[in-house]
């Protein structure tokens, strides 16, 4: 069984950001191998924290960070021919401070290049579900994109669509925006590059997942640029936290299909008298165990990686 990590503390490494799930540290040059290419680097740690309704919950999911990191790394390498990514070929053990147990971080941390984040979430949707379903019911559109009349919940769209959203701070909510609003935020040229890369990767990943009996309903990417303006995909990639995966044999349009994610947690929280603001409630052991099992099943089916 993996060691549970709720929060990473690495003496001597400046904490750059603590998000809902990931802790990000700056890597001083003296922590890097002598042969590391020029540039600035980060250490990104996937903890076992779990968020729901934009609130970080007090109970972790044991091993979740390791599973998320392994899924991301699988997809980063699988899609290298489509898009460069932020990963650097430097082992985590080489940069950890003295006295820190490498076994705790080896499977949940990566060394990455430091990039300038594109300040928009890049979302690809192949099915009408979630916030997209709510928008469609209200307006017949998602992010300003006109869709056919009469679509049912979870129905497959004629073509995948790009639906950007704002990138909210921890505790705030992302808001769907249309492409014109994204252009005003980042410029037309960068917006088009992000849109094209998002849809290209989504189509590839959806085809790959379908071969393994999984439907990729939608996913969220984050992109960043280097000093030369080169675009990279960064943060996490096609994990159960950032994507909606459905077992193909249980898919039925007009319903809300079961998914390989934290739906057990959301369903449980919906039964509580809780205002969906911090602090979040404690989770029962069976909800934690069932959620962990879903993450493990996704890792096994997609990447053929088993966990204890």
UniProtKB/Swiss-Prot annotation:
Tell me yes or no: is Metal-binding among this UniProt entry's keywords: no
Q: Please give the organism.
A: Xanthomonas euvesicatoria pv. vesicatoria (strain 85-10) (Xanthomonas campestris pv. vesicatoria)
Q: Which reaction does it catalyse?
A: 5-amino-1-(5-phospho-D-ribosyl)imidazole-4-carboxylate + L-aspartate + ATP = (2S)-2-[5-amino-1-(5-phospho-beta-D-ribosyl)imidazole-4-carboxamido]succinate + ADP + phosphate + 2 H(+)
Q: In which pathway does it act?
A: Purine metabolism; IMP biosynthesis via de novo pathway; 5-amino-1-(5-phospho-D-ribosyl)imidazole-4-carboxamide from 5-amino-1-(5-phospho-D-ribosyl)imidazole-4-carboxylate: step 1/2
The EC class name is ligase
Sorted alphabetically, which InterPro entries does this protein's record hold? SAICAR_synt/ADE2_N (IPR028923), SAICAR_synth (IPR001636), SAICAR_synthetase_CS (IPR018236)
For this protein, the Enzyme Commission number is: 6.3.2.6
- Which Pfam families does the UniProt record give? SAICAR_synt
Q: List the keywords (alphabetical).
A: ATP-binding, Ligase, Nucleotide-binding, Purine biosynthesis
Q: Which family does it belong to?
A: Belongs to the SAICAR synthetase family.
Keyword ATP-binding attributed: yes
Q: What is this protein called?
A: Phosphoribosylaminoimidazole-succinocarboxamide synthase
Please give the superkingdom of this protein's source: Bacteria
One GO term (biological process): 'de novo' IMP biosynthetic process
Cite a GO CC annotation.
cytoplasm
């Amino acid at each position: 069984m993996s060691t549970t990590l709720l929060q990473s503390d690495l003496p001597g490494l400046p904490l750059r950001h603590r998000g809902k799930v990931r802790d990000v540290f700056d890597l001083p040059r003296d922590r890097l191998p002598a042969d590391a290419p020029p540039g600035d680097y980060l250490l990104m740690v996937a903890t076992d924290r779990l968020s729901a309704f934009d609130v970080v919950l007090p109970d972790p999911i044991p091993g979740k960070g390791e599973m998320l990191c392994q899924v991301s790394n699988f997809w980063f390498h699988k899609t290298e021919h489509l898009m460069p990514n932020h990963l650097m070929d430097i082992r985590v053990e080489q940069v950890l401070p003295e006295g820190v147990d490498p076994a705790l971080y080896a499977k949940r941390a990566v060394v990455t290049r430091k990039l300038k984040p594109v300040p928009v979430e890049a979302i690809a949707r192949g099915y009408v579900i979630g916030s997209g379903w709510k928008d469609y019911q209200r307006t017949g559109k998602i992010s300003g994109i006109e869709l056919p009349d009469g679509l049912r919940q979870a129905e497959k769209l004629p073509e995948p669509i790009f639906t950007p959203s704002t990138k909210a701070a921890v505790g705030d909510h992302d808001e769907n925006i249309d492409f014109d609003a994204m252009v005003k935020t980042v410029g037309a040229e960068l917006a088009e590059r992000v849109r094209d890369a998002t849809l290209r990767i989504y189509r590839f990943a959806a085809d790959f997942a379908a071969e393994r009996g999984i439907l990729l309903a939608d996913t969220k990417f984050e992109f960043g640029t280097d000093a030369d303006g080169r675009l990279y995909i960064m943060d996490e990639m096609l994990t159960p936290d950032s994507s909606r995966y459905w077992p193909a044999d249980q898919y039925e349009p007009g319903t809300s299909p079961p998914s390989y994610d934290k739906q057990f947690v959301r369903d449980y929280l919906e039964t509580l008298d809780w205002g969906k603001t911090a602090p979040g409630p404690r989770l029962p052991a069976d909800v934690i165990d069932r959620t962990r099992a879903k993450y493990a099943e996704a890792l096994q089916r997609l990447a053929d990686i088993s966990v204890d």
